[in-house]
Amino acid sequence: MFLIQCLISAVIFYIQVTNALIFKGDHVSLQVNSSLTSILIPMQNDNYTEIKGQLVFIGEQLPTGTNYSGTLELLYADTVAFCFRSVQVIRYDGCPRIRTSAFISCRYKHSWHYGNSTDRISTEPDAGVMLKITKPGINDAGVYVLLVRLDHSRSTDGFILGVNVYTAGSHHNIHGVIYTSPSLQNGYSTRALFQQARLCDLPATPKGSGTSLFQHMLDLRAGKSLEDNPWLHEDVVTTETKSVVKEGIENHVYPTDMSTLPEKSLNDPPENLLIIIPIVASVMILTAMVIVIVISVKRRRIKKHPIYRPNTKTRRGIQNATPESDVMLEAAIAQLATIREESPPHSVVNPFVK
């Protein structure tokens, strides 16, 4: 059963990534159609831009348990100073292992934005949106880093997304506008960006906080409570029992309290068995019913059309008659005649006749 599941996952994954870019991390990978988007402002039609994709598991990255949890953090570095600014943090808990997709149909989702950031910029991997910018401006150009940390892993995977913003200049080309690009974005690795950010000025550590903002960005501990972080404010999109979001379908959200998150016991039966066992039992019951019906129909047809079998014993007795039996019969008849001759019938005396 496990081999069949792996084969199906591989086929589905191959179909999904045929026309996509894959950035493989240590514990999870990123699948996007493009890691860079360009915006022309002012925008004519749509009032937002986004990079679509999803987080996936490749090969040995697939979690071994039935459920997993993790934390995502979206960072932003502008194209001038390359100072990191944490934008959003998302916490996923109770995520089932469904094929190769990561963080879909999770039982709990909790999202926060930093106080010094804007809600216009966000990420929602469970909805297939890796980066979304509403009402983009020239200051939104730069490099965005998505940090992903699974609870069962010891390191954080980082994926880079780029945004170019162009403005209409005073000179016009044949189409009526000329595009002016901000500073060029060369290929920056996650490690290089981190090293650059260490030289930037960081905000002062709030009172009562044991770590700085930058240390918090680089140290995403799975067991660390994000609700008490002084830089975070909770988003409205915090949900419970969140299902897979599809484009064009309105999703309802419900607030939840992560303190009431139940712990999963190791003795609990796997969720796959809870699905497979009823299916197998139903198939066996249906098969047994079909067999019983077939046997009943066959018996009824046999009773309606019985097979005639002659009594061969009587015929054999008649055919096997020998001349000896005829001789004995004749002797008995002769003896009976002799007895009648020797003993004539008695005369009947009528008492009324003298």
Swiss-Prot record:
Q: Which UniProt keywords apply?
A: Glycoprotein, Host cell junction, Host cell membrane, Host Golgi apparatus, Host membrane, Host-virus interaction, Membrane, Phosphoprotein, Signal, Transmembrane, Transmembrane helix, Viral envelope protein, Viral immunoevasion, Virion
Q: Which InterPro entries match?
A: Herpes_gI
One matching Pfam family: Herpes_gI
Quote a single Gene Ontology cellular component term: viral envelope
Q: Transmembrane residues, as ranges?
A: 296-312
Q: What is the effect of changing residue 345 to A?
A: Decrease in phosphorylation
Q: According to the UniProt topology, which residue ranges lie Intravirion?
A: 313-354
Instruction: List the membrane topology term(s).
Output: Single-pass membrane protein; Single-pass type I membrane protein
Q: Secretion signal: which residues?
A: 1-17
Sites carrying sugar chains: 33, 47, 67, 116
Q: Which residues lie on this side of the membrane: Virion surface?
A: 18-295
Quaternary context: Interacts with gE; this interaction enhances the Fc receptor function of gE.
Could you identify this protein by its name? Answer: Envelope glycoprotein I
